[in-house]
Each structure stands twice: as structure tokens, then as C-alpha cells.
Amino acid sequence: MEEEDARGYNKPCPQCSEVNWAISDEGTFYCKSCHTVIEKTREVDDTEVFSTHGKLQSISRGLRKKRKLEKGWEWYVCEGFQFILIKQAEALQALGVAPQIKDEILCTFWRRYLQKTNQAYVKRPVYRSVLTCRDSDSSATEVDSDLEAFSIGTSSVSDGYTSDASGRLSLPTEDIPSASESAVSVHSGSVDGLSHVKMRKNFKPWNYVKMTMPMTLAFCYLALLWLRASITLSDLLRFVFEKHIPYINAHQYLPEEIKVYGHDVRIFRMQALPVYNDILSKAYELGAFLDLPQFPPITKNCYLHPSVLCMKYLIEANLPDELQQWTCQVAEKTGIDDFHRLTFDPACKRASHIRYDVQAVALIILVLKLLFALDDNTEWQLSKFAERMNQSNKEKTVFDLQSWYQTVRQCYEKAQQKLEEEYGRFMWKSDCPLYYSQTTKSLLQKRKQMSENLQRQFSKLAGAAPNTGKQGPSSFLFKWEEQNTDTISFHGHSLQAVLHQGKKPPTPINTHYWLNSLRKCKTRICQHSELYEESNFPRSYHFMVCLFAFLLRVEHCVIHHEVGLIEELFFQEKKNKRKQKPKKQEMTDFREVPPD
């Protein structure tokens, strides 16, 4: 066949001058006498190419077999959450939290949760209808160093559960079906993924707290609260958004042997950022479910105490340091600084939720209302008076609220715009995409490759700067410096323009105060704590609420509602003192609220 195809070429060989050609397997011509290869190749008809290609495709389709389901470990959902909790604890350690948070605090909480939900440390789990046993020979050779430090099965536990070399749970061998009878669900990578998704909250006979991704943050917050660490709940959620703590796409931290697909996607995939009140409610619910003892007391030296947090947010908001003594007085009069009130006790179910950071900024706003009124009139008159004092006396700078407003507003608007851009560029998809079934895996991989190519091309066209990685974590969002005229520091400014200097103790010049709510709402169905209308309040007050809501990354209604609660305590205390004191004696601390 090769000789017949080469008969049409009659040119002599340039090496030996003979005409004795043949065609190689690659389609090139060579001389059979001297084996010289020339550049000429075989000419192929188009119809022959298409017919041959079609035959190859049909043959390949006929011989192709269905790809078997990728199998790894036979794992449970609680094991996946255990890996994620390990990574979150390590991230908190990297942020400066004490090492006890991983091996002692968080580990103890997790063990107690597994025992309470009958998933471990019990003889017979009540919810697993089908138990599977892993091949101990294959798993014993692989040692996971991460799980060794956080093993939930120890030799001290004698209830039928142990831990193998890889750190995973090893179930008791009695009443477990053989490997041939193992029934791992084809709809999920985990053994109990389907049952975990369909499980209701008050499913009998448990009445348990269902484990979810937001619940992992509740575990972390309880551990931070137990250690009295210098990380508030708002800081924790901000670190989650900045990806310093694994939460979004946390499944990529799982080992390769743990296959996540099907119903597992609904468990470990998060499409929204955590909400402040939601995580706080889950933390209180978790603490009551675990029957935890009373947490260590929050004393004046603790970071979560109002005096410390108020000073922190005064620095953050670029407000004068002299406001600190006023916030301490209000906290003392309302009883907010009492350690009995600040300490978390899971056994006290009727106690209100303690929002340490929100409570601190609400104290600052209340003090600003006492000194400046924040009614769109009084504060600007006081600012003009402070401006005249600064012109006449340049030795000590007096705090000017109008100048502060112009400086802080400019920085706030820039930071707000930057945050909105970060929200728009936030990457929800991970490098390890999740898929619901094996049939959609190839399709999702093609879509991912196409989106990456398009994103790369658009970034080249737009001339965008390459991503340099995430910035280092910081407790402060703003940096106020005296050298930069755009960010003037107001920390050392005096409050002489708003106080009567002749009296001891000094009292505010402002004698008016307006309340956020005229009447206390006693119903729980109106949801007044979730309502906040900007048009109903002065613009200066609204700016204060927006500023501190931005610093804490919470909704405006959360700040506004907390201010109303502290106002209720403050003026109720003043009302009680007014009844006890004689009529002729005047109040020397704060002015009374004018009667209606």
C-alpha cells in the first residue's frame, strides 16, 4: 500500500539519484536505497479524513465505560465540621489568641457537643440507621498531623469509641454491616449527608442543636468569650469577610480523601456572609444546649469591659479622649459595667443577649447626645463657640464637632466605597468547586475554566493590577495622624466648649435631650428592634449611627436599638434618684429631661 502511494512520485533521490520511494508511518517520503527522508508528505483526501475520524469516534464511544463514582473515606458530617473547626482554631491562634483555644477550650466544647447529640462518646448512636466500617488497613498507614492535635477519641474514654492513626472516629465493631453491605449514599459523599439535611430542629428523641457552618462561628465565639480574648464578635465576622478565618468555601480545607458532593454541598457551601445577631443567638443557644458553666467574669481589666471597649472605639472614631470619663459615668449609673451583668451564664435562659461591642458604641452615642444634643441645631452652635475659642486661645485646642464631621465624613465615604467594591469583587467560588453529581462535574469544570479565561482576558484589557493577596489583620480600620491634613487627629482636644468650667464636677451646657422612643414597647411581635427610618431622626444622629454601624459591620437598627435600651436604663435610674432626693437639692451630674 505504501509503495502504491509512492509510485506517483518520480523525482530522483538527491542523495543516491535513484527512484525508489516509500512512505513511512508518519506520512513522510523516504528512499528505500539510502534511507534519506525528504520534506514531501503524503496527500490525503478530505473525505478520507472525515470518514476515518468518524470511525475513530464511534469506536472510542463504543469502548468507553462509565466512570465509577469517586470514593474516598466513608466519613460523617461531624468529621467534616471537625476539620473546619481545627482550621478556624489555627486561624485564631495566628491572630494572636492563646493556644488553649484549640486543644483545651474548643476541643472540650466539641466533645461535649458530640456526646450531647449522641454522635460520639456513647455506646449506640441513636440517629444512624446505617453504620459503615472503614478499611482499617488502608487508613492506618496515613497519619494526619492536624487531627492528632485535635483527636476526639482518647484512651480515657471507655464507651466504645476510639481514635485511629489518622485521627478520625473509629466506631465500635458490633452491629456494623460488612463491607459488602455498606450503603454509602450515592447522593452525597458522606454517610449521613442526606439524613443531616432532612433532619428537623426538634426531631425526637433528641431535641438537639443542628450543626451548620454558622454554628462553627458560634463555637469560636464561645471559645473567645471563655478566654476573654481581645476579639469581639464584630471583629470575628470582619475577619471572616477578609478571609483570615475559614468560613466561605471552607470545604477546600478538607482532606482529599473526604469527597464532598450531592447533599454535602448544601451543608458546607455558604452563599452569604454571617449576620451578627444570628451568630450571637446561635452562640447563646449552643451554650445552653451544652450545659456550660458560668463563664469567667468580665472585670474592668478585661477587653470586653465597657470602659476598655469605649476607649477603643473613641480612638477608632477619632473622638476626644475626655469622652471616656463620661462613658464610664453613664455605664456606672446604668449598671452596665457590673461584672454580674457582663458575665455570660448559659444557665440563665431569660438573660438578654450581651452585645459587648454594640453596647460600647451605644454608650458613646448617648454621651454625644447628652453633650451635643445631635438635633441638627445645638451641635452646630456649640461648634461655632468652639471655633471662636480656638481663635482666641491657641495653646489648647478645643474640640470642634463641625471640623470633626468634615474630616471623618470624608474618610468614612472613601472607606464605604472601598468596602462596596470589595463586596463586588468578593469571590464566592473556590478553587475546588462543589458538584451535586458526577454527571455535572465535567460541565462545572468546563464552566470554571471558561470563566477563568474570560476573567484573565478582561483583567488584561482593563489593565487591572494583579492581586497581591489579602492584607494583614488589624483591629482598627482608620489611621488618624497629625501630619496628614486630610486625617487630623482629635484625640487630645478639650471639651471646654460644651462644659461649664466653673462647676465641680463639670456639667454640660446643653440642657435638652430627645429620646429615641417615647414609649417602651412591651410586645415581641412588632419587631421594633429591626426597624430604623432615617427620615425620622436628625441627620447628625444618623451619621453617628452609620459611622459606628460601618465600624462594626452591623445594621443600623442594631445600633439604634441598643441606644434606646441604654437610654431606658439611664433615665429610669435618674427618675428613681429624683424620687429619693429632696426637691431643693439640684442634680450636679446631668440636666433633667424637660417635661412634655
From Swiss-Prot:
- Any one of the GO CC terms: RNA polymerase I core factor complex
Sequence segments annotated as region (B-linker): 70-74
Gene Ontology biological process terms in this record: RNA polymerase I preinitiation complex assembly
Q: Name one GO molecular function term.
A: zinc ion binding
Locate the compositionally biased regions of type Basic and acidic residues: 583-596
> What keywords are assigned to this protein?
DNA-binding, Metal-binding, Nucleus, Transcription, Transcription regulation, Zinc, Zinc-finger
- Where on the tree of life does the source sit, at the highest rank? Eukaryota
Positions of region (B-reader): 40-69
Q: Region C-terminal cyclin fold: what ranges?
A: 264-374
Record region (N-terminal cyclin fold): 75-263
Coarse class of the primary localization is nucleus
The yes or no answer to whether the keyword Thylakoid is present is no
Q: Where is this region: Disordered?
A: 575-596
- Where along the chain is Zn(2+) bound? 13, 16, 31, 34
Q: Map the zinc fingers (RRN7-type) to residue ranges.
A: 4-39
Q: Does the keyword Metal-binding apply?
A: yes
> PANTHER family this protein is in?
TATA BOX-BINDING PROTEIN-ASSOCIATED FACTOR RNA POLYMERASE I SUBUNIT B (PTHR31576:SF2)
Q: How are the domains described in the entry? A: Although it shares weak sequence similarity with GTF2B/TFIIB, displays a similar subdomain organization as GTF2B/TFIIB, with a N-terminal zinc finger, a connecting region (composed of B-reader and B-linker regions), followed by 2 cyclin folds. The RRN7-type zinc finger plays an essential postrecruitment role in Pol I transcription at a step preceding synthesis of the first 40 nucleotides.
Q: What does this protein do?
A: Component of RNA polymerase I core factor complex that acts as a GTF2B/TFIIB-like factor and plays a key role in multiple steps during transcription initiation such as pre-initiation complex (PIC) assembly and postpolymerase recruitment events in polymerase I (Pol I) transcription. Binds rDNA promoters and plays a role in Pol I recruitment.
The molecule here is called TATA box-binding protein-associated factor RNA polymerase I subunit B
Source organism: Xenopus tropicalis (Western clawed frog)
